[in-house]
Regions:
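Positively charged n-region of N-terminal signal peptides that target proteins for export
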Residues: 1-5
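Beta-strand-enriched cores of mature, soluble protein domains
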Residues: 23-202
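A sequence-level detector for low-complexity, Ser/Thr- and acidic-rich stretches
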Residues: 24-26, 33, 44-47, 51-53, ...
Length: 324
């Protein structure tokens, strides 16, 4: 891993972002599509009123949906867009099984609905580094979507929707008398859902008067007079790649003296081919500035190439680089 001194990263807070004006972001109405899969999904119904019995039964237990009972769903996030991750899906809710034609004990309403709930999706890398959190609110019916109301980490300020929970195997309904430490042993449902997200910001390659901030190993800017070759190791400078380890607070500059590798998966495609990302991390002294070292893939055509940077499954605006 090599961290280079760059004239393209301005140290003063906020100055870095002003270099992005020359770029065109993806269309505002083009959502980022993310599919999340989870396992061991269990619904715990708050039907245990003797406090001495809560979370004591080794299980498995069962429960029945009843009006006004508090419920809590939990599952283990296992993939995002097919990529292995870790994480927790949790969802507290108040059970209100609304019905247009209710049976005794069921609340009446104009539509059949399960009532409102909130979902929290905390996503980590496969080795446990924090990527980000998505928060949504919604109901199983009648609307087709849950509304994404915010996020943190790589998903800071995110809005959007996600569709219905699709269960490949049914969620297990349990009682709050059951010991939740045994959830994985007892098993549960397998689910997937697809998010359609509108990011507050995207990963972007910094724009300079001479073109995108992509340089050769000697620090020289890639240009028509100095094109890139297949297999060459390049460095690009960017914003919006999300949290790092160690963590740096929002709005604070990356300190000197340490490497700050990005937590989220980072991908660079040239004409649709993935490059080998050698290092992606915060750039010392910059606010939201990052350096990415990568190897150009084989088989790129001579002339120009379209380079697209993606972080946390969020694509940035493509930029054009000269190739040979």
């Amino acid at each position: 891993m090599t961290i280079r001194s760059s004239p393209f990263l301005i140290i003063a807070a906020g100055a870095l972002c002003r270099l992005l004006d020359a770029q065109t972001s993806p269309a505002a109405d083009a959502p980022v599509v993310i599919t999340v899969e989870a396992q061991n999904s269990t619904l715990y119904r708050g039907d245990t009123f003797d406090l001495s019995k809560i979370a004591k039964d080794p299980g498995p237990t069962t429960s029945v949906n009843t009006a006004f009972i508090t419920v809590f769903n939990v599952g283990d996030i296992r993939t995002v867009n097919g990529e292995t991750v870790k994480g927790i899906w949790s969802s507290p809710a108040q059970a209100l099984p609304f019905h247009a034609n209710p049976q005794p004990g069921q609340p009446i309403a104009d539509v059949d609905s399960t009532g409102m709930l909130q979902c929290i999706w905390q996503i980590l890398t496969s080795d446990g580094k924090y990527i980000g959190t998505l928060i949504d609110n919604g109901a199983a019916a009648p609307g087709p979507h849950h509304i994404v109301t915010g996020g943190d980490g790589a998903f800071l300020g995110m809005t959007g929707v996600h569709g219905a929970m699709q269960f490949a195997t049914p969620e297990r309904a349990a009682s709050t008398s059951e010991d939740p430490a045994n959830r994985r042993t007892l098993g549960g449902g397998t689910l997937r859902t697809t998010f359609y997200l509108f990011p507050r910001s995207r990963p972007n390659v910094i724009a300079t008067p001479g073109g995108p901030a992509v340089t050769h190993a000697d620090g020289k800017l890639v240009s028509a007079a100095s094109p890139v070759a297949a297999g060459e190791v390049l460095t690009l400078y960017a914003t919006g790649l999300g949290p790092t380890t160690p963590f740096v607070e929002i709005g604070q500059a990356f300190p000197q003296g340490l490497a700050y590798p990005v937590n989220a998966p980072v991908d660079i495609k040239i004409n649709g081919q993935s490059s080998e990302v050698l290092y992606a991390g915060g750039y010392a002294g910059s606010v939201d500035g990052y350096q990415v070292n990568f190897r150009v893939p084989a088989g790129i055509p001579v002339g120009t190439g379209s380079l697209q940077l993606t972080a946390a499954w969020i694509p940035g605006a493509p930029v054009t680089i000269a190739t040979k």
